[in-house]
């Protein structure tokens, strides 16, 4: 859902940022007239020398122009110096790309309206999965890696036969540095040190990166190593409701989700008004404290014994750890039926008829809960790959690739405790002054533990493993200088497994159930940066986790396995392809491109617990995937593109589990679906690109995707024997394999369509006089519409698809100084359709993020930098229903980093 974009604060931030850029650039212009010192390494294009940020822009345009398909790229500005601190934040600058943020940093991307599960990511040519926390999908988590470890990113939006299958949206290539990439022989090195300050947490944390590379005099052998370490300590402040729900006026008071009574409801109309209006399930202010540390290492050995042969060994390791504490206080009984809202009495109320919500209420007999949780997540990623390239003759050459990677996600510690104060009177909330930040008062002194009882403890641990291995080879033969035949294949294995354990009993009894919890609690406060209305309780007692851990001897407690936490998928992907590349002249125009076909066979073995039985189901499917890409150059500065391809994306890993529940007496089954086929689509792309000057581009692209199958959840009556489950599961029961069962599961639905437009404009202002000629602009806009069938007659847009998105950057660069201000806008998008608890949908409202950076070259080797992220302290605003009821309204503050960078 899009909210109005004409915010005074947004315009103010944009104006101040642009003014600051001009102000900062003025001294640099003054020094521009002085004799210039030796310039850093440069990229030369048509006798014009550009460096730094402008050099990286020109490199990206060179790649975009020469590719046969639709490709956008980002390059490092210098050794171990990427344009953004976060990979996802960098990729979002490209047309068609939007990102999802968590705790103030980008984590996953969507390309042309298709989310992370539809996008493949390769690191040094090897498909990779980076898992963190609760991520159990195919989506890649970019927060795992420091951007300094990489020197380029390419986003391939059209498919060719030589690129492995598996993406409906895009294939993203991340490339780390290699020693023979540097111009000079001998040593090359870089070291950067930063301190980053968050204005919400008021903490300063370090960020350090270094690179050392060596090559021999003949540039035939080299070794490179890089390291990056960083910390973050953000705070998340928010208000959330955990959705809204409504009662039913056709039922009696105290039935269903109805309140027990309504004192001011003296008429049937008033009663109906209250019982049919939505109310927040768990209204609460909350904040989380996070401590993150990230460490990454890369190593590359590169050998070129001759011009015809190259061997590269790439090694990579990354670690990402997060500790989070999340204290909050809430009216928990609004989310319960029996023993909760059915006992609550409405003492006073007001209705917002536009949203159909109880916008203000005073309630008696409300259960108040104070809780606190601690989680430690640990993630590790390992990869090794060996790439071989050899030219057998001037016309015949080949490549081979072998490699493996593993991603481990662990939650070794996760525990939480609850203080409950039941049947409290006078609980009040009021949204009338602000529909995102209500006044909340609990009706008693919530800083005192006298009314609270320690009632529950929850402890769990779990994790997931993703393993991937690849062997691939390709041969190329130049039939003529204008025509090349390519053929090759891959054999890939993919493994995924999860596990989970939890405490057997969570409700405390006996001496552990403490009444009066002052000795076991601590006072926390929300400091008012949320502009919370007057009258709200901003300080409250919460469980002190470490005191209670000691009191309950929690680390001595045994854990039991959770059956639904154990599942596995073993996948084997085999592919072969043949492709013809052409580059010729036709009617005075350069015509180039490729045409090919790929055959892919997928075999899966899925395992999981159905009740307490461990079930194994095998599946196999095959796809024939033709593709065609054409680039026509009517002039040297103009490229017209056309692309068409059949594509596929494999089902989400969680959807393949045969685990779930089985009730033979009622003939009901609820599980994933290990027999799922992939998402399949036919893509069409048309684009025009005008490279009107050095570093200049004006481009437009339209795209259309006919999604032939889309995975949805349905409940249907089908024969047991059609499910692929073993008949032995029915042994000893009255049910037989020939009977029908009511089955809730994932199925391949009928699909839908997606279409859109991208516009891209980039230009240095070299046509302006003097000082102004050092400025430049980069901007892109993306429009996407989609409609897919979610089953049961429900049609709507794809989740994670924003209708409108744009990115802009205004930059200034001279020999020793550069600065830029960037904005990234994303319109609202869906998270779930339909939503839960009777809400029509769940989604995120539009956002706009502003960033700025500047740097000054003190010398040829030493650079001072200043970066500011999220200048407007943008809120992440989640909603439910088309009426835009608040679900989670969160912010994490601004970050400012100052640093020094040295290179040799």
Where are these regions (language model features)?
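N-terminal periplasmic "start-of-domain" segments of outer-membrane beta-barrel proteins
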Residues: 49-82, 108, 116, 126, ...
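Extracytoplasmic beta-strand/coil segments of soluble accessory domains associated
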Residues: 88-130, 157
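Outer-membrane beta-barrel translocator/receptor signature
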Residues: 132-139, 148-155, 162-265, 289-295, ...
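Transmembrane beta-strands of outer-membrane beta-barrel pores
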Residues: 157, 176, 195-199, 229-233, ...
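Outer-membrane beta-barrel transmembrane strands
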Residues: 176, 193-195, 204-215, 281-326, ...
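Flexible glycine-rich, low-complexity coil/linker segments exposed to the extracellular/periplasmic environment
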Residues: 250-280, 342-366, 427-455, 508-565, ...
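Gram-negative outer-membrane beta-barrel transporters
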Residues: 704-706, 723-833, 872
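C-terminal beta-signal and adjacent terminal beta-strands/loops
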Residues: 708-709, 825-834, 855-904
């Amino acid at each position: 859902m899009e909210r109005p974009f004409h915010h005074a604060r947004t315009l103010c931030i944009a104006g101040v940022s642009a003014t600051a850029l001009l102000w900062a650039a003025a001294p640099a212009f003054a020094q521009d007239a002085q004799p210039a010192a030796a310039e850093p390494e440069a990229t030369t294009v048509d006798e014009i020398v550009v460096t730094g940020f402008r050099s990286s822009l020109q490199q990206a345009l060179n790649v975009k122009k020469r590719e046969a398909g639709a490709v956008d790229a980002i390059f490092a500005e210098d050794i171990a110096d990427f344009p953004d601190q976060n990979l996802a934040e960098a990729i979002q600058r490209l047309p068609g790309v939007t990102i999802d943020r968590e705790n103030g940093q980008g984590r996953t991307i969507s390309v042309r309206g298709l989310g992370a599960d539809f996008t493949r990511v390769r690191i040094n040519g090897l498909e990779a999965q980076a898992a963190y926390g609760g991520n159990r999908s195919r989506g890649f988590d970019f927060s795992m890696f420091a951007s300094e470890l990489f020197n380029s990113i390419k986003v391939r939006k059209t498919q060719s036969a030589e690129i492995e299958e598996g993406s409906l949206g895009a294939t993203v290539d991340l490339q780390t540095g290699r020693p023979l990439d540097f111009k000079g022989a001998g040593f090359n090195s870089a070291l950067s040190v930063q301190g980053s300050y968050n204005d919400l947490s008021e903490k300063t944390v370090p960020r350090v990166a270094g690179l050392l590379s060596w090559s021999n005099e003949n540039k035939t052998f080299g070794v490179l190593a890089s390291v990056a370490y960083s910390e973050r300590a953000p705070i998340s402040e928010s208000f959330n409701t955990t959705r809204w729900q409504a009662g039913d006026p056709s039922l009696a008071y105290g039935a269903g989700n109805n309140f027990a009574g309504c004192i001011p409801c003296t008429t049937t109309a008033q009663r109906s008004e209250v019982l049919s209006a939505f109310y927040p399930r768990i209204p609460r202010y909350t904040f989380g404290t996070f401590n993150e540390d990230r460490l990454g290492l890369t190593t590359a050995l590169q050998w070129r014994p001759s011009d015809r042969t190259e061997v590269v060994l790439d090694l990579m390791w990354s670690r990402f750890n997060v500790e989070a504490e999340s204290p909050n206080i809430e009216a928990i009984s609004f989310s319960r039926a029996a023993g909760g809202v059915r006992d609550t009495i409405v003492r006073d109320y007001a209705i917002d008829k536009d949203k159909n919500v109880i916008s203000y209420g005073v309630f008696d007999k409300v259960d108040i809960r104070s809780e606190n949780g601690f989680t430690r997540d640990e993630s590790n990623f390992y990869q090794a790959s060996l790439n071989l390239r050899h030219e057998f003759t001037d016309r015949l050459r080949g490549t081979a690739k072998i490699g493996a990677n593993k991603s481990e996600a662990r939650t070794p510690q996760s525990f939480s405790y609850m203080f409950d104060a039941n049947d409290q009177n006078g609980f009040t909330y009021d949204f009338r002054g602000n529909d995102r930040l209500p006044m909340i008062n609990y009706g008693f002194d919530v800083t005192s533990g006298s009314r609270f009882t320690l009632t529950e403890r929850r402890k769990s641990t779990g994790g997931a493993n993703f393993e991937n291995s690849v062997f691939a080879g390709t041969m190329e033969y130049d039939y003529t200088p204008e025509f090349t035949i390519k053929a090759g294949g891959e054999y890939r294995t993919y493994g995924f497994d999860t596990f989970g354990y939890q405490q057997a009993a969570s409700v405390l009894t006996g001496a552990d159930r403490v009444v009066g919890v002052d000795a076991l609690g601590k006072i926390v406060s929300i400091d008012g940066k949320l502009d919370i209305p007057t009258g709200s309780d901003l300080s409250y007692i919460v469980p002190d986790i470490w005191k209670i851990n000691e009191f309950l001897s929690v680390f001595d407690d045994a854990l039991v396995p959770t059956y639904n936490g154990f599942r596995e998928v073993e996948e084997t992907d085999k592919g072969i392809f043949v492709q013809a590349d052409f580059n010729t002249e036709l009617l005075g125009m350069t015509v180039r491109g490729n045409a090919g076909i790929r055959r892919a066979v997928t075999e899966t073995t899925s395992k999981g617990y159905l009740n307490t039985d461990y079930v194994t189901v095998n599946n196999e499917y095959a796809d024939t995937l033709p593709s065609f890409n054409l680039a026509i150059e009517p002039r040297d500065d103009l490229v017209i593109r056309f692309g068409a391809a059949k594509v596929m994306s494999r089902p989400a890993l969680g959807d393949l589990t045969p685990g779930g529940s089985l009730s033979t007496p009622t003939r009901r089954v609820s599980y994933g679906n290990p027999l799922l086929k992939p998402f399949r689509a036919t893509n069409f792309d048309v684009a025009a690109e005008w490279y009107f000057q050095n570093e200049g581009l004006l481009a437009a692209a339209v795209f259309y995707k006919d999604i032939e199958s889309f995975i949805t959840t349905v409940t249907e009556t089908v024969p047991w024997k059609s499910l692929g489950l073993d008949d032995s599961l029915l042994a000893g029961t009255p049910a037989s394999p020939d009977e029908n069962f009511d089955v809730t599961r994932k199925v391949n639905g009928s699909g839908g369509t997606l279409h859109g437009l991208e516009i891209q404009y980039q230009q240095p202002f070299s046509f302006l006089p003097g000082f102004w000629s050092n400025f430049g602009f980069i901007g892109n806009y993306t429009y996407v519409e989609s409609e897919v069938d979610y089953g049961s007659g429900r049609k709507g847009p794809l989740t994670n698809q924003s209708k409108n998105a744009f990115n802009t950057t205004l930059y200034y660069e001279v020999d020793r100084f550069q600065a830029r201000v960037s904005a990234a806008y994303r319109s609202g998008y869906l998270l779930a359709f339909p939503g839960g608890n009777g809400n029509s949908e769940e989604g995120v409202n539009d956002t706009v993020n502003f960033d700025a950076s500047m740097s000054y070259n003190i010398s040829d080797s030493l650079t001072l930098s200043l970066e500011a992220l999220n200048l407007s302290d943008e809120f992440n605003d989640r909603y439910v229903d088309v009426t835009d009821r608040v679900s989670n309204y969160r912010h994490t503050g601004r970050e400012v980093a100052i640093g020094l960078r040295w290179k040799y």
